[in-house]
Regions:
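Serine-hydrolase catalytic machinery in alpha/beta-hydrolase-like enzymes
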Residues: 56-169
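Primarily recognizes the serine-hydrolase "nucleophile elbow" in alpha/beta-hydrolase
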Residues: 159-221
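Hydrophobic h-region of N-terminal signal peptides that target proteins for export
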Residues: 10-17
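An N-terminal hydrophobic leader/cap segment in hydrolases
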Residues: 18-82
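The feature captures the conserved acid-bearing segment of alpha/beta-hydrolase catalytic domains
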Residues: 200-265
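Loop/turn elements at helix/coil->beta-strand transitions in domains of secreted/extracellular proteins
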Residues: 89-92, 116-119, 170-173, 196-200, ...
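Sec-dependent signal peptide recognition
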Residues: 2-8
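C-terminal catalytic histidine-bearing segment of alpha/beta-hydrolase fold enzymes
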Residues: 254-292
Length: 292
């Protein structure tokens, strides 16, 4: 092995190690483990749309913007520097985190989409000052605060509205993608007008079946393409009233489809599935097929 080849090998190992360390050491204060939650009895409907509260998830949203074919600009909305990336219109994903907040799986998904040419904005709902715990990830228990869905829908709407005001966002190609509680929000998001709509949606880790009416089904008033992906034996959804898949509720758009993972002995029992290469390809192929 010559010195040049050896040097390249060292560089590759260093970059790989850095990438692994970045995810393993990733920290966010907008996570269940760090958040000081509000008691449900102290949560009031007026707080949901309080301008200060609504602005916090947007200001603290994580941002990923692709630069060329290999680099990603990583920042937040409040710290973004337009001089750090090329001036162009980016097809953009609004990414909605799960009930535990922002974690390494959030940034892994954001980076994956950015590597495939999409800008990604992930509003941090737990940046709100008043926010009640909605799940316990240690016990796979959800539904601890029913009204969280309304808050998440408000945050999604606000992110879409503000994203369309950004000069670098292609407002004809904005997509909504979410995992778990973020997937529930993605499925049930019901924009009041087409300006607040999106060009497509990806629902990960949700069955669209629930005991609460507002959690059940899919809202798609503008018949946009929807991809849903769920593991048949997802440990979060083994109660009878949660079993099923979003394909039972999808619209008639020709690009809409439901993927149920039932044959893979490992993946079929997982909650998040977008780490799997086959599922990644399905997601990217879907997005690329509906770009306007």
């Amino acid at each position: 092995m010559n010195k040049f080849t050896f040097y390249l090998l060292l560089m590759f190992i260093a970059c790989s190690s850095y990438s692994a360390d970045y995810y393993s050491d990733f920290y966010s204060k907008f996570h269940n483990s760090m958040k000081k939650f509000t008691k449900p009895s102290n949560m009031f409907v007026d707080d949901f749309r309080n301008p200060k509260e609504v602005n916090l998830p947007w200001e603290n949203a994580l941002v990923r913007i692709p630069i060329g074919e290999t680099n990603i600009y990583k920042t937040t909305i409040k710290n973004i520097n337009d001089k750090k990336f090329p001036k162009q219109k980016y097809k953009t994903i609004i990414y909605l985190h799960g009930c535990a907040g922002i974690w390494k799986g959030t940034v892994k998904r954001m980076d994956f989409f950015a590597e495939n040419g999409f800008a990604v904005i992930a509003p941090a709902s737990m940046a709100r000052e008043k926010y009640a715990r909605s799940c316990n990830t240690d016990t796979n228990q959800g539904g601890l605060y029913r009204s969280v869905l309304k808050i998440r829908q408000i945050d999604a709407e606000n992110a879409i509205l503000n994203a369309k005001k950004l000069g670098w966002v292609d407002d004809k190609n904005i997509f909504l993608v979410g995992l778990s509680e973020g997937g529930i929000t993605t499925a049930t998001y019901n924009p009041k007008n087409s300006w607040l709509g999106v060009s497509g949606r990806i629902i990960e880790g949700w069955t669209c079946n629930a005991g609460w009416d507002e959690y059940r089904g899919v809202n798609s008033p503008y018949n946009e393409p929807i991809l849903s992906i769920v593991a048949k034996y997802d440990p979060w959804f083994q109660a009878d009233y949660l079993k099923g898949h979003c394909g039972q509720f999808l619209n008639k758009n020709g690009f809409s489809k439901s993927i149920i993972i039932d044959e893979d002995p490992i993946l079929s029992k997982q909650h998040g599935v977008l780490h799997d290469p086959k599922i990644k390809k399905i997601a990217i192929d879907f997005l690329n097929s509906i770009i306007k």
